[in-house]
Amino acid sequence: ILGNTISLNLIIGIGLSIICLLFLDPILRFFGASDQTLIYAHEYMVIILLGNVVSHMYFGMNALLRAASKPKQAMFATIFTVVMNVILDALFILVFKWGIQGAAIATILSQLMALMWQIKLFRNKNELLHFKKGIYRLKRKLVDNILAIGISPFLMNVCACIIVIFINNQLVRFGGDLSVGAYGIANGIAMVFVMFVFGVNQGMQPIAGYNYGAQKLDRLIRVLNLSIIAATAIMVTGWLIAMFLSYYCARMFTTDKQLIDLGIKAIRVVMFCFPVIGFQMVITNFFQCIGKVKISIFLSLSRQLLILLPLLAFLPMIWDIDGVWYSMPISDFSAAVIAGVVMVWYMN
């Protein structure tokens, strides 16, 4: 598994980098970059894509650490990467004045440092998973199993990319570049709390999978309930910050008064249904953990493609730019309801 995971990450990382670098400007245009923002997006993405293999290897190794019952090491790698990214951002942007390129370099370097530490861990021959000869040749059965388990989160990320493309294009169409900037602020704040829930889900995966396989259903339900409580607490905290501290959140990103005002509205609207979306994320992850891939995929698609995409197309025709904003919390609430209904149906 270790060898096949490394090989797949190398192949996919290199392949995606080559394809994206060859067609970078059209891809950025497709994602909603305007004449004013294209040059900055290009500068940033060239560096990110050149270091894409590092990112693939880092995330792959972290997943393997969790699977090998090393959650503390995986958590350390994640926290180390975030902290180093912040430090290097300040150094490269504020001190060296490298601008957007400095931010990209900081991202790749922080992941590279964590990756070197991960490699050191997997070189220990006393560990269950460790490097050795002959494990890197791809095996069809292993690859099929890896891809089957990973298809749900993969589709979630693909859907998220499609939605971001559509949101950006709708925001440019109905509100201009300022609205795109406001969404960037709101999305940046929202992702802080979403990433915490991702962490809860990642910690839940090996525990839920083991107990389901061992038919210890009481422990399975317990870990599910604890994960829902933790995710909900995280998202309620995010909601409180969005509702009452949105000015300070927007102020961290810009000093432009007009953008701050629009950013405040964007933060409050985008995060309005956060108290219920943590539940939806955990339920989706739960079905992935117990091998119910089709249900997990359906719940992944329901929030983004099946609900949000039609709303983004329809509501702006009624409410103009407000329709773009309101489509997001409506989609979040609807997806949480669907997840609840599916969970009740499955339990019965």
Where are these regions (language model features)?
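Small-residue-rich hydrophobic transmembrane alpha-helices
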Residues: 1-18, 55-74, 182-246, 277-296
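Transmembrane helix-bundle signature of multi-pass secondary active exporters and lipid flippases
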Residues: 48-55, 144-211, 231-239, 256, ...
